[in-house]
């Protein structure tokens, strides 16, 4: 009996010592790292099934070892997921430069200064390297060829990209297969990607949609927060007084930017049940935020910078465009009017770069970057020399919508000029950008977003 009592007493003492050690360890751990805040219990709304699934990327990926994977796709594992999202890269070279006489190729100056005094201003040929950007819905196939990536559009146009220069290809792809589960494929294993209309898919997350409010107006459409998060199961990360907190986007009603100054940037998050939470301390909810993409059907896509964004209000997401909603593009055609009064009509190459209606006009306005497919654009009217103070171009769309864009990006002085392939002539006409007064573009037979509104005749 004494032995049992002694053993029992020893066991109790040992347990008390272990309990004290555990409490002490927990207290020290809390001093070093605050416990994560418990996410509020909010039930996400029910997701619509089949209709929304047609907007997800889908295709077949062949690997270098001969294995094929078919299923729903998401770039980089947690980035681009829909046909309206963009694939980005850098062109290997510029084939259009060969059509311009060497002495007429654009030049740029690089002033040399010593102690603030300019001692020379040498000119050198301008950099004609160009980036590539196309919606996944406009793509037919992507192939890997060593250091090159070859992209084929639905129209049949082929573009060679430099694999190691800012290419989305190297982000890898996540595939939801039927038989192998979820597979993450490194780009080094990928030989080719063929895009296909999706069949009936299993469970898939809902898409983010809503309205982004800015000082210059509202933009409504499908949303990518911080250029990445685009489905309801993605999470918004931040810190509260209680520690780190992650919120699923499908539990959020709105996000409002709160900025006292650059060092005290935060976001006010309102949940679907009305509760409000202030998040700070991460890139996603502060100055490090890279902006909000909005697929606004009026313009194609806009990127609202963090400083321009005032509030995002989410709304139930409908079905986005399916693969078949993106018709094959075609050559860019229209007329160029020079400042000297010449009018040149034919197939166009804009900025010694864009030659297809599915390629985009990229220019900013008050913290919002517009990415407008050329097939939506009816005319571009540039400010005259007497309007230098304004420095805004008037862009009219085939829908009748008009937007004033800053003379920067594709509308800026760095534009390399235009080629006009006139019927019956062996070589195209080249017009430097400084000589361009107006560009009128022909209306394509079909586009996405669909062409609405009246037909614009290009009246001056």
PLM regions: where:
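Compositionally biased alpha-helical segments
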Residues: 9, 19-460
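N-terminal Sec-pathway targeting helices
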Residues: 2-13
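Initiator methionine at the very start of the polypeptide chain
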Residues: 1-2, 460
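N-terminal alpha-helical "arm" segments
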Residues: 15-17
């Amino acid at each position: 009996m004494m032995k049992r009592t002694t053993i029992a007493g020893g066991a109790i003492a040992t347990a008390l010592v272990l309990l004290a050690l555990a409490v002490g360890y927990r207290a020290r751990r809390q001093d070093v790292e605050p416990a994560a805040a418990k996410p509020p219990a909010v039930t996400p709304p029910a997701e619509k099934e089949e209709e929304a699934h047609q907007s997800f990327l889908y295709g077949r990926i062949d690997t270098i070892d001969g294995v094929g994977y078919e299923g729903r796709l998401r770039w980089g594992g947690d980035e681009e997921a829909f046909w309206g999202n963009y694939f980005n890269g850098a062109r290997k070279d510029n084939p259009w430069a060969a059509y311009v006489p060497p002495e007429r190729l654009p030049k740029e100056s690089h002033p040399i200064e010593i102690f603030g005094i300019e001692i020379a201003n040498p000119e050198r040929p301008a950099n004609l390297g160009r980036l590539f950007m196309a919606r996944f819905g406009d793509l037919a196939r992507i192939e890997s060829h060593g250091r090159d990536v070859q992209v084929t559009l639905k129209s049949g146009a082929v573009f060679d990209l430099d694999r190691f220069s800012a290419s989305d290809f190297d982000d890898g792809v996540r595939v939801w297969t039927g038989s192998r589960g979820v597979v993450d494929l490194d780009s080094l294993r990928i030989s080719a990607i063929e895009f296909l209309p999706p069949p009936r898919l299993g469970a898939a997350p809902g898409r983010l949609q809503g309205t982004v409010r800015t000082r210059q107006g509202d933009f409504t459409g499908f949303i990518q927060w911080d250029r990445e998060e685009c489905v309801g199961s993605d999470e918004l990360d931040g810190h509260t007084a209680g520690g780190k907190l992650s919120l699923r986007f499908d539990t959020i009603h709105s996000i409002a930017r709160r900025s006292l100054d650059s060092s005290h940037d935060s976001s006010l998050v309102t949940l679907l049940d009305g509760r409000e939470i202030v998040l700070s301390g991460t890139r996603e909810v502060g100055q490090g935020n890279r902006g909000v993409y909005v697929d606004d059907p009026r313009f194609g896509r806009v990127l609202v910078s963090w400083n321009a964004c005032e509030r995002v209000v989410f709304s139930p997401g409908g079905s986005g465009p399916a693969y078949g909603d993106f018709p094959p593009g075609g050559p860019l055609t229209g007329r160029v009017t020079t400042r000297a009064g010449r009018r040149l009509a034919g197939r166009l190459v804009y900025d010694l770069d864009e030659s297809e209606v599915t390629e985009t006009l990229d220019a900013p306005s008050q913290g919002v970057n517009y990415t407008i497919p050329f097939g939506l654009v009816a005319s571009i009217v540039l400010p005259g020399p007497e309007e230098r103070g304004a420095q805004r171009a008037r862009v009219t769309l085939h829908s009748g919508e008009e937007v004033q864009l800053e003379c920067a990006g594709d509308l800026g002085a760095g534009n390399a000029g235009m080629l006009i392939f006139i019927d019956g002539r062996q070589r195209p006409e080249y017009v430097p950008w400084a000589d361009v007064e107006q560009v009128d573009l022909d209306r394509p037979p079909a586009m996405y977003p669909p062409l609405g509104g009246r037909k614009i005749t290009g009246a001056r």
